[in-house]
Amino acid sequence: MGPLKAFLFSPFLLRSQSRGVRLVFLLLTLHLGNCVDKADDEDDEDLTVNKTWVLAPKIHEGDITQILNSLLQGYDNKLRPDIGVRPTVIETDVYVNSIGPVDPINMEYTIDIIFAQTWFDSRLKFNSTMKVLMLNSNMVGKIWIPDTFFRNSRKSDAHWITTPNRLLRIWNDGRVLYTLRLTINAECYLQLHNFPMDEHSCPLEFSSYGYPKNEIEYKWKKPSVEVADPKYWRLYQFAFVGLRNSTEITHTISGDYVIMTIFFDLSRRMGYFTIQTYIPCILTVVLSWVSFWINKDAVPARTSLGITTVLTMTTLSTIARKSLPKVSYVTAMDLFVSVCFIFVFAALMEYGTLHYFTSNQKGKTATKDRKLKNKASMTPGLHPGSTLIPMNNISVPQEDDYGYQCLEGKDCASFFCCFEDCRTGSWREGRIHIRIAKIDSYSRIFFPTAFALFNLVYWVGYLYL
């Protein structure tokens, strides 16, 4: 307006003598001023309002209601789309929120997923500038929904807080998207032969409950299933290795059904069982070997140590079985605990054998000493602690070596002779000769060596073979 005012009150117009000219210029000036003010107001509105709002038509709530009413008018939600014409194709997609915990006792696992299904329903096509209708769960029961169910589910819960966690979208071309959030307790049959070094593939199977293959076909929308960050999952004893999906057809008396399956590969973590079972068992076995270094005459000490280690192994075996179902086969942990129990029990039996023969030796030695004393009293010049051995009809005295005699009625050639003075046979000749007094010395070498070899075979066999 500044330039217009300057022009209006310029000396040129003031000197003009024509009132008509002045009036025309005045009206023109006022008209141009109004146009400029309107242009400024429109520029201010463009700064605060999205420019597309001017181009796009405004959609009112009544228009959406009218579209829904027209779609549902005459719509029968009991009939699937394209019934009698072609199968309805259901594209499925799964987003895994979390997996766990895994319950090995009941052989099941818990999974939290968002399950999505997409299909086309020509009855839901509409003409509107709005391409998609975003609806809540109230619309779900008014249109046809696939009767999908999870085949290996023991318990399934839909989430309802704060509202039902369901979503429904309808596109103008008739495409329908239906998603919902589910928490499922699914069966997972665990093969525990290698427990606790076992690996498992837990399936999640779903299919149509009533529509066979010629009515409904399931397809994966994406080649792989998306998952959330596994580090927040409550797997505890297990580690998530990966997953894979597959499609198969099962044959039943009611028809052929398409089954969609997701396999979750899990590997068990050994940390818990190493601390709770393996290390205590190994330490208990090593503790039982302390008995070999205790004097054989310390009966209470060695007996109490052996019984304590046996009872400890029994307790460890019972605790180890509590984390397992009652399977009829032997697991890797059962084998390890059983062998450890055998080693501990063998250490106790070793002292029992040693104590028995040592006591027997002392009794026979005392009897022999009495006989020698009686003979010595009858034979002049014979040392009381010696025996007579006939050589060419000559009796020669020999120091007693406190040996054992073979049991009466036994053949020394065929009996594993553990006695010092086995009279005949190859045992007496020195091929195999075991001294009872040195059983502890033999055990100090045999038990650790045998247990080390067992551990080598056990861990290599289960971890690498």
Swiss-Prot record:
Residues 1-35 form the signal peptide. One of its GO terms (biological process) is inhibitory synapse assembly. It holds the Pfam family Neur_chan_memb. Its main location: membrane. It is found in: Postsynaptic cell membrane; Cell membrane. The chain crosses the membrane at residues 274-294, 301-320, 329-349, 445-465. May be palmitoylated. It is a multi-pass membrane protein. Residues 295-300, 350-444 are cytoplasmic. Keywords: Cell membrane, Chloride, Chloride channel, Disulfide bond, Glycoprotein, Ion channel, Ion transport, Lipoprotein, Membrane, Palmitate, Postsynaptic cell membrane, Signal, Synapse, Transmembrane, Transmembrane helix, Transport. It catalyses: chloride(in) = chloride(out). GO terms for cellular component: chloride channel complex; dendrite membrane; GABA-A receptor complex; plasma membrane; postsynapse; postsynaptic membrane. Glycans are attached at N50, N127, N245. The keyword Cell division does not apply. It comes from the Eukaryota. Disulfide bonds join C188-C202. Residues 36-273, 321-328 are extracellular. One of its GO terms (molecular function) is GABA-gated chloride ion channel activity. Belongs to the ligand-gated ion channel (TC 1.A.9) family. Gamma-aminobutyric acid receptor (TC 1.A.9.5) subfamily. GABRG1 sub-subfamily. GABAARs subunits share a common topological structure: a peptide sequence made up of a long extracellular N-terminal, four transmembrane domains, intracellular or cytoplasmic domain located between the third and the fourth transmembrane domains. Gamma subunit of the heteropentameric ligand-gated chloride channel gated by gamma-aminobutyric acid (GABA), a major inhibitory neurotransmitter in the brain. GABA-gated chloride channels, also named GABA(A) receptors (GABAAR), consist of five subunits arranged around a central pore and contain GABA active binding site(s) located at the alpha and beta subunit interface(s). When activated by GABA, GABAARs selectively allow the flow of chloride anions across the cell membrane down their electrochemical gradient. Heteropentamer, formed by a combination of alpha (GABRA1-6), beta (GABRB1-3), gamma (GABRG1-3), delta (GABRD), epsilon (GABRE), rho (GABRR1-3), pi (GABRP) and theta (GABRQ) chains, each subunit exhibiting distinct physiological and pharmacological properties. This is Gamma-aminobutyric acid receptor subunit gamma-1. The gene is GABRG1.
